[in-house]
């Protein structure tokens, strides 16, 4: 299977899922290939016309050097000496997962397919062809430059070494913001599964404690009048339908009652992350960007832009990290609640030897999440023309780490909830039965003293496989 790309509108979040997570290839439509060659020829005609009019015309990266060299046109001798390979492959460190690198390759095509990068079709085909072989290593760390030229230099260096590229094509490979688009898409895809997982695990905790269901009443849908909180209320009602008929008589603890509000906020932030990903993936972000010909400009025009700096993606990833960290705090509170609640304490914490120490593990994961989450502010680093770095990689690393904390924190609550039902001889609500079965397969019921760390690892890994679906994504789960 391949994803057909006819225009940049075809580069969607679902396309990222298929190409980056499932491992499908990319098929560039014939009309897109023709359009790219046509626009490349048009751009070259524009450059020739500008130089004929003014031999010192400044077209960034084509008649000039990059960065601080943008102010002066290159002499013929300097043009002859310019490197034929990419010159920015300098970053190093822990590598990005293959699923993210594949997403970057896909996102790179957005600038190409409608001609705005002025690359030939053979360059776009070579980029798409990278998906059919093992990909270069791209570091997740050390990306502190303006735009994404460091990571993209690592990704496309070998391609530049084996192809005879025009100056604009070399610039087009490393400019723009495909990395930020891919990174926020990766977090958004993971967020969908983590939201469903969190709702299921928290509903299991509600059921184990036999907490009152009035906090999720249908009456609140219209009273709160918020689409995301209403969706959370409905999800919890569905998950808890058919549960134990006898519940706690007085109101539940705050950690139970605020679940729809907190989960509603997660849904709200998830929606923004998905929207940020969709817009980022299809945006033309090249610098300089080729504005296509029209009646007033028959050869088009070329302008320098800041498209390589995606400010929305880091904010969206920060938002996801913050709500995931909040869920870790809720998970820690529910861990303590289940170990102390009158309905479950005797089932889970009747002694000091079995499950009670898990409350300390939950605190550890919650604190790690707190350390990772927060706003990724603009860097004070920079040099010369490149005086403001882009922050997408750091925002992704923080959100990714927070998400891993959430998987572990949810595993603890899930293990306690399933154990409480086991010890009470209580069946879960029908909508939670499959989840409970999955929990017990990785974290069997505890009937005596044993190390629970390996079980926690196994359940966290199982939850990771829920989040990272598809053969490529699963390899990094």
For each feature predicted by the language model, list its residue ranges:
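FAD-binding core of FAD-dependent oxidoreductases
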Residues: 58-82, 87-112, 137-159, 165-182, ...
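C-terminal auxiliary extensions adjacent to catalytic cores
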Residues: 2-52, 89, 151-153, 158-477
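Surface-exposed beta-strand edges and their flanking turn/coil or helix-capping segments
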Residues: 74-75, 119-121, 186-188, 425
């Amino acid at each position: 299977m391949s994803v057909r790309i006819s225009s940049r509108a075809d580069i969607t979040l679902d396309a990222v899922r298929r190409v980056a997570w499932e491992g499908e290839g990319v098929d560039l439509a014939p009309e897109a290939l023709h359009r790219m060659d046509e626009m490349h020829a048009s751009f070259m005609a524009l450059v020739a016309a500008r130089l004929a009019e003014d031999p010192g015309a400044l077209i960034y990266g084509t008649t000039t050097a990059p960065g601080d060299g943008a102010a002066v046109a290159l002499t013929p001798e300097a043009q002859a000496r310019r490197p034929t390979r990419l010159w920015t492959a300098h970053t190093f460190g822990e590598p990005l997962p293959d699923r993210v690198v594949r997403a970057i390759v896909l996102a790179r095509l957005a600038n190409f397919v409608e001609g705005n990068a002025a690359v030939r079709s053979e360059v776009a085909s070579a980029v798409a062809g990278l998906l059919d072989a093992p990909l270069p290593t791209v570091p997740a760390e050390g990306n502190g430059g303006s735009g994404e030229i460091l990571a993209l230099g690592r990704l496309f260096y070998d391609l530049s070494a084996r192809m005879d590229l025009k100056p604009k094509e070399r610039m087009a490979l490393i400019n723009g913001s495909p990395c930020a688009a891919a990174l926020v898409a990766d977090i958004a895809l993971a967020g969908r599964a983590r939201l469903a997982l969190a709702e299921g695990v928290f509903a299991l905790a509600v059921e184990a404690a036999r907490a009152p269901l009035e906090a999720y009443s249908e009456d609140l849908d219209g009273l709160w009048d918020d689409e995301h909180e209403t969706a959370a209320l409905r999800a919890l009602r569905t998950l808890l339908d058919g549960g134990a008929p006898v519940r706690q008589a007085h109101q539940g603890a705050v950690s139970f009652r605020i679940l729809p509000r907190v989960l509603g906020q997660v849904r709200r932030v998830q929606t923004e992350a998905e929207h940020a990903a969709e817009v980022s993936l299809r945006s033309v972000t090249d610098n300089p960007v080729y504005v296509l010909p029209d009646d007033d400009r028959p050869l088009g025009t070329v302008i320098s832009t800041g498209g390589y700096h995606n400010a929305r993606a880091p904010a969206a990833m920060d938002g996801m990290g913050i709500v995931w960290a909040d869920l870790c705090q809720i998970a820690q509170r529910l861990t303590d609640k289940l170990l102390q609640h009158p309905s479950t304490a005797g089932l889970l914490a009747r002694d000091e030897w079995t499950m009670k120490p898990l409350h300390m593990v939950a605190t550890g994961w919650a604190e790690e999440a707190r350390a990772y989450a927060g706003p990724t502010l603009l860097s004070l680093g920079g040099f010369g023309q490149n005086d403001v770095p882009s922050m997408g990689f750091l925002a992704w690393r923080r959100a990714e780490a927070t998400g891993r904390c959430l998987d572990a924190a949810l595993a603890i609550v899930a293990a306690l909830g399933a154990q409480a039902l086991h010890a009470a001889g209580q069946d879960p609500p029908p909508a939670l039965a499959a989840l409970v079965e999955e929990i017990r397969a990785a974290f069997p019921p505890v009937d005596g003293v044993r190390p629970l760390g390996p079980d926690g690892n196994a359940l966290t890994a199982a939850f990771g496989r829920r989040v990272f679906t598809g053969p490529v994504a699963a390899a990094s789960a």
